[in-house]
C-alpha cells in the first residue's frame, strides 16, 4: 500500500471509485489542469445540453435500433455523470486512444474526453455541451488515511508535504 502519491484527480476517481474512503486528497497542484467533458459533433446544432442529448437518444434508438454510443477512456465517471443527468439511452464504447476521432470513424456518436484548452476538440469539429463539464482535474497530492493514523508515518508525510508546498510557492512547475 502507498503512503503518499501524486496523480491526476480524473485518474484517481476513474480508477478507484469510492477511493475517498481510503485516501485523502491533500492538495491540488498548479499543473496538469484539465476538464473531463461531454462533446458532440459541431453539426449536431439541436444538441446544446444533456437534456437535448437525452431527447435525441430516444429518437436515435427508434431510428437505428441501437443506443447512442459514447466513446470514452473514463467509463465510470461518464456513466455516473450521464445517469445523474437522466440520460439512459446510451452505450459506452471504451476508447483506446484518439477518442476525438471516434464519431468520425463511425465508432461512436459522441465522446467524453479530457481537455485542457479545447483545441483538439475544435480541431476535430467537436464542441462541449453547455452543461457537459463532468469533472475538473489537476495533479494532486494523495495521502493514505491509514498512514495518517501511524504517528511516525504522519510525521514524515507532514515534512514531505511542507517541502513540496514551499517548493511550489517559490517556483512554478
Question: Which role does the model predict for each range below?
Answer:
Residues 1-173:
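Domain-level signature for soluble enzymes in the chorismate/prephenate branch of the shikimate pathway
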Amino acid at each position: 500500500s502507498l503512503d503518499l502519491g501524486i496523480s491526476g484527480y480524473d485518474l484517481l476517481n476513474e480508477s478507484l471509485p469510492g477511493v475517498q474512503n481510503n485516501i485523502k486528497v491533500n492538495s491540488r497542484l498548479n499543473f496538469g489542469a484539465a476538464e473531463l467533458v461531454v462533446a458532440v459533433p459541431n453539426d449536431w446544432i439541436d444538441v446544446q445540453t444533456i437534456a437535448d442529448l437525452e431527447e435525441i437518444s430516444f429518437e436515435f434508438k427508434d431510428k437505428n435500433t441501437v443506443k447512442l454510443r459514447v466513446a470514452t477512456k473514463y467509463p465510470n465517471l461518464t456513466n455516473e455523470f450521464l445517469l445523474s443527468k437522466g440520460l439512459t439511452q446510451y452505450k459506452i464504447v471504451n476508447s483506446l486512444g484518439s477518442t476525438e476521432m471516434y464519431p468520425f470513424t463511425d465508432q461512436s456518436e459522441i465522446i467524453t474526453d479530457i481537455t485542457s484548452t479545447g483545441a483538439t476538440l475544435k480541431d476535430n469539429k467537436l464542441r462541449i455541451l453547455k452543461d457537459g463539464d463532468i469533472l475538473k482535474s489537476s495533479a494532486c497530492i494523495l495521502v493514505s488515511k491509514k498512514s495518517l493514523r501511524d504517528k511516525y508515518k504522519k510525521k514524515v508525510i507532514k515534512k514531505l508535504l511542507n517541502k513540496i508546498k514551499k517548493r511550489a510557492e517559490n517556483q512554478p512547475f
